[in-house]
């Protein structure tokens, strides 16, 4: 795939060095183009790209509350439809907290109503903007400020909420998982979402150097390691048909992924083995 050179997210924003969210937004907007309206919930992306009076966005952009990105995007879509404008893409960007927790009700409603919008969840697996608190998307065993490891706790004790399958259960015509570390796979999925008649949901996995604890130069490498170990699986569901879009030639041990991050370094060998067993069971079910 030839990646367009034009940028719709300007450099000079205030993202952390190695920020994965901005990589994802840049790639998505290269596919969607200038005829796009973006809606962004409160979160990392909003804070780093629009410190008043500055903005890094080169397209129309709307900042909304933590919980209602999907609702506002659906309103924008209906307004454009009323004006006879079918040439404008409407995309919502929200983090995992604004998607799996606070914004789930609005997202569910927008998907169920069938609005012609694209919703991209940039998942860094915690509330990174407000202090690295756990979310429903925080993986089992991860240490956060509200699920810390210590004498009484080993970190997050709940499994990661499966948002893509929840969206698929709504009958959404296009649902996909993606990773910033596999840009062509992600951009192809954005293209399919753009061409979908109806709502589309993409769950984008993006390493967070601040919250996960790793070298900022290793963001893309760590994202690849998540996929190569089976900790994050790339797939799409088109009109109910499930397809894995990338299969590692030989899966690496999950321990390689866990050991590369500070948030998992407290885990015992027994706990790591338990995580490996879970990953193995999921991969076996999907024949990866």
UniProtKB/Swiss-Prot annotation:
Residues 149-159 have a biased composition (Basic and acidic residues). Its cofactor is [4Fe-4S] cluster. Its EC number is 1.2.7.1. Gene3D superfamilies: 3.40.50.970. The keyword Oxidoreductase applies. InterPro entries: PorB-like, THDP-binding, TPP_enzyme_TPP-bd. One of its GO terms (molecular function) is 4 iron, 4 sulfur cluster binding. Keywords: 4Fe-4S, Iron, Iron-sulfur, Metal-binding, Oxidoreductase. [4Fe-4S] cluster binds at residues 16, 19, 44, 208. It comes from the Archaea. CDD domains: TPP_PFOR_porB_like. It catalyses: 2 oxidized [2Fe-2S]-[ferredoxin] + pyruvate + CoA = 2 reduced [2Fe-2S]-[ferredoxin] + acetyl-CoA + CO2 + H(+). It is an enzyme of class 1 (oxidoreductase). PANTHER family: PYRUVATE SYNTHASE SUBUNIT PORB. This is Pyruvate synthase subunit PorB. The lineage of its organism: Archaea, Methanobacteriati, Methanobacteriota, Methanomada group, Methanobacteria.
